[in-house]
A protein has these predicted regions:
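Cyclic nucleotide-binding regulatory module and flanking cytosolic helices
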Residues: 1-36, 80-81, 86
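Cyclic nucleotide-binding regulatory domains
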Residues: 12, 38-100
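Residue-level recognition of specific faces of alpha-helices
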Residues: 23, 49, 71-74, 94, ...
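A generic structural signal for short hydrophobic patches within well-formed alpha-helices
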Residues: 80, 111-112
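Conserved active-site beta-strand element of glycosyltransferases/polysaccharide synthases
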Residues: 104
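Polybasic "coupling" helices that flank or enter modular domains
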Residues: 116-164
Length: 164
């Protein structure tokens, strides 16, 4: 269940009580299933929902002018993506599944409701985003200053930390 995966993920960032758990478990959304190697989002696409990953892996990436891809991050169970739909409707990146993926598609209005119902949840989601930004800063250093071996090692350690 996507809601349980989300609870596991955000529980790392805040001490949630039973009421917070209930708010998460009552999120209204539509189940979504995508096969392996499926483009879920194309850059420039109009966005209409936040997706919570239940099972599977995906990559968020940007396509460079010469056709190469720059992977921005890996999306794992419990991750949410496309929170920018809360303030902007067009995606500035693409998302493609690495494995088959199951998720929960949540309308922006429903996600805003969730944020207004619990200060702890708002803090947990904010802290989750702060951690993602920290990961992206590390990626900038990794790509700019580390050798290929160091980049791969750091990336694998980051994945290991997130999968646990």
């Amino acid at each position: 269940m996507a809601r349980k995966a989300l609870l596991r993920r955000i529980s790392f960032y805040a001490d949630l009580d039973d009421a917070d758990h209930q708010v998460i478990m009552e999120i209204n959304g539509r189940d979504q299933h995508s096969e392996k190697n499926t483009e879920i989002i194309d850059a420039g696409q109009e966005m209409d929902s936040v997706l919570i990953v239940k099972e599977g892996w995906a990559i968020r990436y940007k396509t460079l002018e010469d056709g190469r891809r720059q992977v921005l991050n890996v999306l794992l169970p419990g991750d949410m993506f496309d929170l920018q739909v809360l303030v902007a409707a067009e995606s500035d990146h693409s998302v493609k599944t690495v494995t088959s993926l199951k998720g929960l598609s949540v309308r922006p209005s429903e996600f805003r409701r969730l944020l207004t119902e619990s200060g702890k949840l708002t803090l947990a989601f904010w802290w989750m985003q702060v951690q993602e930004e920290a990961f992206l800063r590390e990626q900038i250093v990794r790509n700019g200053k580390q050798t290929a071996r160091e980049r791969i090692g750091h990336f694998l350690l980051e994945l290991y930390r997130r999968v646990l």
